[in-house]
Amino acid sequence: MPHVVPITADFAVARALRTEDFEVVAAQGFRTIINFLPDGETQFQVSAADARRLCEKAGMAYAHVPAQKYGVFTDGVVMAARQALASLQSPVLAYCASGQRAAIVWAAAKSQSMPVDAVLATLTSAGFDFGYIRDDLEQQADRPRWQPAGGSADQSPIEQPAA
């Protein structure tokens, strides 16, 4: 059973899910899974294609937003995360190797619509000490003012469950 860390009432993070975890988190009430692991990052991880199939089987929506460990603040990752968070049903469980990257990407996405102090306070309440990313979050908060209209969104990673 995965160790789930709630960030908000509608969003939680976890370490990489195993095959047997998908049914468990669906039974816990999660409606969407966001996978921030690039395929092949860890030796025994569930592939993105298998994770999608497991989500479909469990009746959950799925988004794969591969975020390299040192690439969490890239336009494509942040925009895809924002899109997934805005359009998919909650509650959402996001995962990566440890859960920290998922929390950081959430913070980057939320900092464009929520004060950075509030984002960091929310993370602190959940047990994460991410004060060291304040400058990165401040840059994300300023993006809407200087990013070109339409941004640089990559192709949508969002996959809905099969009907």
PLM segments and residue spans:
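Cys-dependent protein tyrosine phosphatase-like superfamily
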Residues: M1-V92, A107-A163
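A phosphate-binding catalytic loop at a beta-strand-loop-alpha-helix junction
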Residues: V92-A103
